[in-house]
């Protein structure tokens, strides 16, 4: 059994991770941690998430930087479901103790220190760790994930977008002079568990945000190798992402070429479901680890639609896929 600790355990993604780790036949949940000043420290985990009563009842523990060496005794895996700056500050400490780190923040997703000053507002001080980090888009980086000790789990919007676009880019099907246009709507859980007026029940309304300045746009462009236009929307539902992507294809690309690109990429990927000429929906992926993908073509115009659960395939489930890849377990272990 691989001893696994979870830092940032009390957020929505943390709760999903705690459940996945507990269900995994090869992992042992060895600790649930929050910041040392968190009001949740000392509480039973199931007092926050009642559906996990009798499943995850461990006491939530405070994490102090001075205790990292001590708590890493015999620990194999550290999962960070923490804020970007927190992951930036503590990932190297855990790596130094010989653990394998899976980070769900944005702190190590792009191997360029300047990226963080420009888009995240902090100076990145860990060049060695940043250079060694692998971007954990599970279906696209399995060989690198299997060898890495720091895996940066992609964001929810990038997962929904990149998985739709990378097969096209890989085969050179996207017109070079056109930027794919991504419109994606996410459930309110994407805003996190912290109270906010904008996500309050009586206030939330379907609306765009972060127009031209959302930090996931450069993350998508960087890992696609092609500039995109990305507009996120906040939806008035709890969980899930539905992305509609408009792509201008290279002249002469046939529907058969598009279908072949997607089939080649995903025919052996159990967590991706191809739905040609059908319509993905949030209902079909909610509370699952699946990625649903469909497309329709008219001449040079291609519309691609993808759906995921933002907390699962967009976060916790993809982290678990990366754990499975890294340690040689079946891809679907604990997920289905």
From Swiss-Prot:
Keywords, in A-Z order: Amino-acid biosynthesis, Arginine biosynthesis, Cytoplasm, NADP, Oxidoreductase
GO molecular function, a single term: NAD binding
Active site: 156
InterPro entries xrefs: AGPR_AS, AGPR_type-1, NAD(P)-bd_dom_sf, NAGSA_dehydrogenase, Semialdehyde_DH_NAD-bd
GO biological process: L-arginine biosynthetic process
Record EC number: 1.2.1.38
Cellular component GO terms, alphabetical: cytoplasm
Annotated catalysed reactions: N-acetyl-L-glutamate 5-semialdehyde + phosphate + NADP(+) = N-acetyl-L-glutamyl 5-phosphate + NADPH + H(+)
Pfam families: Semialdhyde_dh (PF01118), Semialdhyde_dhC_1 (PF22698)
Known pathway: Amino-acid biosynthesis; L-arginine biosynthesis; N(2)-acetyl-L-ornithine from L-glutamate: step 3/4
Gene3D superfamilies per record: Dihydrodipicolinate Reductase, domain 2, NAD(P)-binding Rossmann-like Domain
Subcellular location: Cytoplasm
Subcellular location, principal: cytoplasm
Function: Catalyzes the NADPH-dependent reduction of N-acetyl-5-glutamyl phosphate to yield N-acetyl-L-glutamate 5-semialdehyde.
Family: Belongs to the NAGSA dehydrogenase family. Type 1 subfamily.
HAMAP family tied to this protein: ArgC_type1
Protein name, UniProt field: N-acetyl-gamma-glutamyl-phosphate reductase
Organism per entry: Moritella abyssi
Organismal lineage: Bacteria, Pseudomonadati, Pseudomonadota, Gammaproteobacteria, Alteromonadales
């Amino acid at each position: 059994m691989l001893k696994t600790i979870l830092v940032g355990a009390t957020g929505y993604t943390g709760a999903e991770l705690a459940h996945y780790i507990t269900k995994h036949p090869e992992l042992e949940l060895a600790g649930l941690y929050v910041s040392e000043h968190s009001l949740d420290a000392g509480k039973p985990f199931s007092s926050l998430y009642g559906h996990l009563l009798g499943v995850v009842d461990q006491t939530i523990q405070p994490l102090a930087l001075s205790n990292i060496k001590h708590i890493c005794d015999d620990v194999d895996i550290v999962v960070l479901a923490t804020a970007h700056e927190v992951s930036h500050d503590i990932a190297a400490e855990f790596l130094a103790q010989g653990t394998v780190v899976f980070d769900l923040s944005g702190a190590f997703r792009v191997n360029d220190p300047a990226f963080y000053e420009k888009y995240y507002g902090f100076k990145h001080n860990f060049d060695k760790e940043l250079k060694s980090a692998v971007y954990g888009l599970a279906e696209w980086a399995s060989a690198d994930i299997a060898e890495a000790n720091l895996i940066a789990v992609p964001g929810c919007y990038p997962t929904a977008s990149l998985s739709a676009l990378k097969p096209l880019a890989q085969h050179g099907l996207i017109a070079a002079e056109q930027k794919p246009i991504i419109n994606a709507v996410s459930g309110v859980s994407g805003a996190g568990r912290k109270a906010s007026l904008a996500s309050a029940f009586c206030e939330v309304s379907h609306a765009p945000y972060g127009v031209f300045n959302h930090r996931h746009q450069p993350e998508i462009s960087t890992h696609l190798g092609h500039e995109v236009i990305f507009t996120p929307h906040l939806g008035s539902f709890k969980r899930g992402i539905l992305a509609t992507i408009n792509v201008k294809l290279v002249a002469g690309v046939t529907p058969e070429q598009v279908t072949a690109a997607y089939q080649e990429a995903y025919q052996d990927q159990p967590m991706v479901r191809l739905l040609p000429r059908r319509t993905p929906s949030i209902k079909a992926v909610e509370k699952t680890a699946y990625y649903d993908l469909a497309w329709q073509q008219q001449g040079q115009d291609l519309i691609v639609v993808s759906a995921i659960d933002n907390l699962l395939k967009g976060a916790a489930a993809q982290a678990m896929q990366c754990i499975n890849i890294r340690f040689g377990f079946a891809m679907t272990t604990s997920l289905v």
